Amino acid sequence: MPQPYIFRTVELDNQSIRTAVRPGKPHLTPLLIFNGIGANLELVFPFIEALDPDLEVIAFDVPGVGGSSTPRHPYRFPGLAKLTARMLDYLDYGQVNVIGVSWGGALAQQFAHDYPERCKKLVLAATAAGAVMVPGKPKVLWMMASPRRYVQPSHVIRIAPTIYGGGFRRDPELAMQHASKVRSGGKMGYYWQLFAGLGWTSIHWLHKIQQPTLVLAGDDDPLIPLINMRLLAWRIPNAQLHIIDDGHLFLITRAEAVAPIIMKFLQQERQRAVMHPRPASGG
């Protein structure tokens, strides 16, 4: 039987952060999810429920999304990574495994880079290195840049095949299910998320990410073409690439197939990812 979620609102820096935790067993390192742009935490529940029920999972709405308050001022990825670390402190988590999806994949890269001792393993799904990337078609990017699909969920039913590809091209029901779970935080929160990634890139420090990393890519992703995930897997030293026969939201549409791949990766016993240099001997 699925574990119930524990919802909490965390107050940090005059910011209300809505969190959801699916409790698990202590023998598995908890998994922290960074969601896509505009996406409230409920949208990843189908993926969470496909994972091992013993795995504790932490999801949250970033500022301006879903049930989290919208900040008065814009933010950038380093500041949001810091806020996430403080949220984990508040919730009493030490080291976690991290998965980032699309926009959340950029934030996951920043978190793994800035807080290596907090991130044991890294999973990057349908994401890129930021400004240094091979973009999707202009029409698709223009649709993505508008918050309309989250402010007006019925809109996503019309554009989902074009922007998400994969199963959304074949099954209209998927778009309806997706739209039914949308909880908009408003246009300003969406624009703050766009601003967070404006001009940002990880390309110059990806080689410093030492965590074991699984890069997951859809082979029919209109938003982030496959070549971008190949670039991530090439630049991150301890990375492996796995290609999924689906589109941008394969984590949801192919949850039952993708979850075992992720669980196998997370449970592999490998050399400790974060190596701390020994102090120099005196003399």
Swiss-Prot record:
It comes from Ectopseudomonas oleovorans. One of its GO terms (biological process) is acylglycerol catabolic process. The gene is phaZ. Belongs to the AB hydrolase superfamily. Lipase family. The lineage of its organism: Bacteria, Pseudomonadati, Pseudomonadota, Gammaproteobacteria, Pseudomonadales. It holds the Pfam family Abhydrolase_1. This is Poly(3-hydroxyalkanoate) depolymerase. It comes from the Bacteria. Complements a mutant that does not degrade PHA; might be a lipase. Residues 30-253 form the AB hydrolase-1 domain. GO terms for molecular function: monoacylglycerol lipase activity. Keywords: Hydrolase, Lipid degradation, Lipid metabolism. Transmembrane segments: none annotated. Pseudomonas oleovorans accumulates poly(3-hydroxyalkanoates) after growth on medium chain length hydrocarbons. Large amounts of this polyester are synthesized when cells are grown under nitrogen-limiting conditions. When nitrogen is resupplied in the medium, the accumulated PHA is degraded. InterPro entries: AB_hydrolase_1 (IPR000073), AB_hydrolase_fold (IPR029058), AB_hydrolase_sf (IPR050266), PHA_depoly_arom (IPR011942). The active site is at S102 (charge relay system). Its EC number is 3.1.1.-. One of its GO terms (cellular component) is membrane.
